[in-house]
Amino acid sequence: MLRLLSKRLYCKIATKSNEKATKLDFKQLTHPTKVPQTPVDAEFPDTSSSEIQIDTKTIQLLERLSLVDLDSERALATLKSSIQFANKIAHINTEHVRPLYTVLEQQQLQLRNDQVTEGDCRAEVLRNAKVTDEDYYVSPPGNIPLEQ
């Protein structure tokens, strides 16, 4: 097993115990450029009193598009609470807010050189798949449980 790991460059790097791992300096992350230090007040409309009504046609459409079974009461309650939350945050004023791409804006990302270390390992990769068809993975259909 160790011989197999030593062939791959990324495994060599992971198995070296004498190299120090790059750690995040959380003291530097106290105030990234676009994240405010203090919370911004926002007024949310009170939507807890209004009951969300979803017709069966909409539920069937959501089930088909998301491949999620919404037949249980728990799933419907989760969907309704998600809609209430979305209604709350839809009223937040974001007019003068710059887009945030990452919370770790001041942290440098360490990249390795993009070099091919091994090639043509298709057969080895396909051995990880439970079901294959003509050198392709076969994924399970939707939310149908797989046979054990």
Swiss-Prot record:
Keyword annotations from UniProtKB, A to Z: ATP-binding, Ligase, Mitochondrion, Nucleotide-binding, Protein biosynthesis
Molecular functions per Gene Ontology: ATP binding; glutaminyl-tRNA synthase (glutamine-hydrolyzing) activity
EC number(s) recorded for this UniProt protein: 6.3.5.-
Stored InterPro entries: Asp/Glu-ADT_sf_sub_c, GatC
UniProt-recorded name of the protein: Glutamyl-tRNA(Gln) amidotransferase subunit C, mitochondrial
Additional remarks: This protein may be expected to contain an N-terminal transit peptide but none has been predicted.
Location (main, coarse): mitochondrion
Family the UniProt entry places it in: Belongs to the GatC family.
Subunit structure, interactors included: Subunit of the heterotrimeric GatCAB amidotransferase (AdT) complex, composed of A, B and C subunits.
Species whose genome carries this gene: Drosophila yakuba
Enzyme class label: ligase
Function: Allows the formation of correctly charged Gln-tRNA(Gln) through the transamidation of misacylated Glu-tRNA(Gln) in the mitochondria. The reaction takes place in the presence of glutamine and ATP through an activated gamma-phospho-Glu-tRNA(Gln).
Gene Ontology biological process terms in this record: glutaminyl-tRNAGln biosynthesis via transamidation; mitochondrial translation; regulation of translational fidelity
Reaction catalysed by this enzyme: L-glutamyl-tRNA(Gln) + L-glutamine + ATP + H2O = L-glutaminyl-tRNA(Gln) + L-glutamate + ADP + phosphate + H(+)
NCBIfam families: gatC
Subcellular compartments: Mitochondrion
Gene Ontology, cellular component aspect: glutamyl-tRNA(Gln) amidotransferase complex; mitochondrion
